[in-house]
């Protein structure tokens, strides 16, 4: 009785169920079920087809359509066939093969188990067809074009942007199903037209969720659409992508009018226009793309005026105002069209380690490409110190191992020609690599090992180097000391001069007479230095900036203590002054990080190990004079005039606001030594 009830629930499912039971064998993968997507070396879809389960007597001929895949510039569009299929109501015959299923021939014992496993998966799928909540019911109503039911469910609190368990939304279902009325209702209720589908392909989704591929296949066809290729990846596709695949002009226009982004790309990197057929839909998308780009430019220009780049960078980088101003000015020229379009922007960041060179490059890429991973390319030039390693840079020549793989730089620049490229520690690279960079910086193009030319005139190249870092640090410290003495002499006249020591500038005389000869001696060529637009100098941190670094590091550990151990961490103002003493001009912010770990985090770990920190407690870091709390060993003479640095101690704050010091035991040692906690 249950089986008959299940068979009445859907139309294609019972025939598929009976076909599985009757089938004596199933052929190997890829039989008559249709072709999958063939992906080219650029990731473009070569074919989108799906098999159709047609009703008895109906024609099974595929209805060819035409789509387009962009293989580079828009003017080089190549027409490719994609899918549409006749209606699907008949399951595969016993001779047909289900996609993605292996052959069962020759294994009689496992055949029965395999067929019954698939059959039971289908039974479970069919029996669970009935929506069990409002969100699932909304999906069903959206596909059935039941406008009244959609309105009722939305009024009762159904989430208009809720996702199916496999990743799509009700708006995507209505768009692929040609249900314009439902699309209008959903958009009016606040549906987001720019949400991307989380469903990839049948087999990948089945593997990710740990279910059988047949269950995913039937669910996709019953709950979404039965005319899409099961092997194609739809991850990241928006409702506009699906409306274009359905070639529905009215729904495409409705989505665009409601704010759908025609430039949004799916996981494969394709916009809706890449799937459009020749006709009204393609014309509408081209017009919308042009208008959207113009609005986007105006919106970004207004945003830049209200929130300048320098201000954004200062939120993530402490100090280095001169470096931020130099980079911000160059980026502003580029964004507003006041730059040489035939040459890329090239920077050389000079300074000691750990003062923000790499972080500034990362934040620049984040600003330019909105967190896109492809927009930031980082190459550690210490990996290219030998001559034979140059091949890894642009790819091996024909006949050599790795020729088909391409180079580390050229391969990534193909994917994003306007990326921000960081050459970290460029002073360690082999001279032959610098020769390649000459062409890259001068002409904005690069030829890979396959002989193909990559045009990257719109890219931004940033090199970092520790060359002349000692000279820059010593000169900056000298300038800061002179400015500090000057401000002390003028403190009675103008209190604003106290901060003069924090703002210093490297003189032109120092750059020309000290730095440039060092760079020329190292890189050994003027033409290489002449192709650099800006040489940016990173200076050592001043005292106020070091205090910010300490507080930033303490805030990091306070957040970690709260998340992992439910412990609230506080500290006195004097703690930052004590930790600043651990700063080393040669190691930059890393020395502060290590000092906090040695003097604070070590105590936290020891106290936690000794069960001195109850859950939900509040800790405070305080400063004590170490001379009063020195643990003396009888074998060692007591210190007389020796001055010890202040000691940081942990105190626990009770519920009645009383504090008590934690007695953290020093680790035992075979020899009797003196410990200072």
Swiss-Prot record:
Q: Which residues form a coiled coil?
A: none
Q: Which organism is it from?
A: Mus musculus (Mouse)
Q: What is this protein's function per UniProt? A: Functions as a regulatory ATPase and participates in secretion/protein trafficking process. Has ATP-dependent protein disaggregase activity and is required to maintain the solubility of key mitochondrial proteins. Involved in mitochondrial-mediated antiviral innate immunity, activates RIG-I-mediated signal transduction and production of IFNB1 and pro-inflammatory cytokine IL6. Plays a role in granulocyte differentiation.
Q: How is its activity regulated?
A: Disaggregase activity is inhibited by ADP.
Give the residue ranges for region: Regulatory: 477-505
- Positions contributing to ATP binding: 316, 318, 353-358, 425, 466, 531, 590
Which residue ranges does UniProt annotate as crossing the membrane?
Answer: none
Q: Where is this site: Cleavage?
A: 126-127
GO terms for biological process?
granulocyte differentiation
Query: What compartments host this protein?
Result: Mitochondrion intermembrane space
Molecular function (Gene Ontology), one example: ATP binding
Q: What is this protein called?
A: Mitochondrial disaggregase
User: What InterPro entries does the database record attribute to this sequence?
Assistant: AAA+_ATPase, Ankyrin_rpt, Ankyrin_rpt-contain_sf, ATPase_AAA_core, Clp_ATPase_C, ClpA/B, ClpA_ClpB, P-loop_NTPase
One matching Pfam family: AAA_2
Quote the PTM field.
Answer: Proteolytically cleaved by protease PARL. ATP-dependent protein disaggregase activity is stimulated by PARL-mediated cleavage of the N-terminal autoinhibitory peptide.
């Amino acid at each position: 009785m249950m089986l008959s009830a299940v068979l009445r629930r859907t139309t294609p499912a019972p025939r598929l169920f009976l076909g599985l039971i009757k089938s004596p064998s199933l052929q190997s993968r890829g039989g008559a079920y249709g072709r999958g997507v063939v992906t080219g070396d650029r990731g473009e879809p070569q074919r989108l087809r799906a098999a159709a389960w047609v009703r008895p007597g109906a024609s099974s001929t595929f209805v060819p359509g035409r789509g387009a895949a962009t293989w580079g510039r828009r003017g080089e569009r190549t027409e490719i066939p994609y899918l549409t299929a006749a209606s699907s109501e008949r399951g595969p015959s016993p001779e047909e093969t289900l996609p993605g299923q292996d052959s069962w021939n020759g294994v009689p014992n496992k055949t029965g188990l395999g067929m019954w496993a698939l059959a039971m998966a289908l039974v479970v799928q069919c029996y669970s067809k009935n929506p069990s909540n409002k969100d699932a019911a909304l999906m069903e109503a959206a596909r059935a074009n039941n406008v009244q039911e959609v309105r009722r469910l939305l009024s009762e609190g159904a989430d208009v942007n809720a996702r199916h368990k496999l990743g799509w939304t009700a708006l995507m279902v209505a768009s692929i199903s040609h249900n314009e009325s439902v699309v209008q209702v959903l958009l009016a209720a606040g549906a987001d037209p720019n949400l991307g589908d989380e469903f990839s392909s049948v087999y990948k989704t089945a593997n990710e969720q740990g279910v059988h591929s047949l269950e995913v296949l039937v669910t996709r066809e019953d709950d979404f659409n039965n005319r899409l290729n099961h092997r194609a990846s739809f991850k990241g596709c928006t409702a506009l992508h699906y409306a274009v695949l359905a070639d529905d002009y009215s729904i495409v226009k409705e989505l665009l009018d409601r704010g759908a982004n025609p430039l949004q790309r799916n996981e494969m990197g394709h916009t809706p226009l890449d799937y459009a057929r020749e006709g009204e839909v393609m014309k509408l998308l081209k017009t919308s793309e042009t208008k959207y780009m113009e609005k986007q430019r105006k919106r970004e220009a207004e945003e830049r005026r209200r929130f300048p780049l320098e201000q954004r960078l200062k939120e993530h980088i402490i100090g280095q105002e001169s470096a931020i101003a130099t980079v911000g000015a160059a980026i502003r020229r580029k964004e507003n069209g006041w730059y040489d379009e035939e040459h890329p922007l090239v920077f050389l960041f000079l300074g000691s380690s750990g003062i923000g060179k790499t972080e500034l490059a990362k934040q620049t890429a984040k600003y330019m490409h909105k967190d896109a991973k492809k927009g930031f390319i980082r190459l550690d030039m210490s990996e290219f110190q030998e001559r034979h390693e140059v091949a890894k840079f642009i790819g091996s020549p024909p006949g050599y191992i790795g020729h088909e793989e391409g180079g580390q730089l050229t391969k990534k620049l193909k994917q994003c020609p306007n990326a921000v490229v960081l050459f970290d520690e460029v002073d360690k690279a082999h001279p032959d690599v610098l020769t390649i960079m000459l062409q890259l910086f001068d002409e904005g193009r690069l030829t890979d090992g396959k002989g193909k030319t990559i045009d990257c005139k719109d890219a931004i190249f940033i090199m970092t180097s520790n060359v002349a870092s000692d000279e820059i640090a010593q000169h900056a410290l000298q300038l800061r000391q002179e400015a500090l003495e000057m401000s002390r002499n003028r403190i009675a006249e103008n209190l604003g001069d106290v901060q003069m020591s924090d703002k210093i500038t490297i003189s032109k005389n120092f750059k020309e007479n000290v730095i440039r000869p060092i760079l020329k001696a190292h890189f050994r060529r003027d033409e290489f230095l002449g192709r650099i637009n800006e040489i940016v100098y990173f200076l050592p941190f001043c005292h106020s900036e070091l205090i910010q670094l300490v507080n930033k590091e303490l805030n990091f550990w306070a957040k970690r203590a709260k998340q992992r151990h439910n412990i609230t961490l506080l500290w006195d103002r004097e703690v930052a002054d004590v930790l600043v003493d651990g700063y080393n001009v040669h190691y930059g912010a890393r020395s502060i990080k290590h000092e906090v770990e040695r003097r604070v985090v070590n105590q936290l770990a020891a106290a936690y190990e000794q069960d001195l920190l109850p859950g939900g407690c509040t800790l405070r870091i305080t400063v004590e004079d170490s001379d009063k709390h020195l643990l003396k060993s009888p074998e060692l003479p007591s210190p007389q005039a020796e001055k010890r640095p202040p000691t940081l101690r942990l105190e626990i704050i009770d519920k009645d606001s009383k504090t008590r010091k934690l007695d953290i035991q020093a680790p035992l040692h075979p020899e009797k030594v003196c410990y200072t906690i």
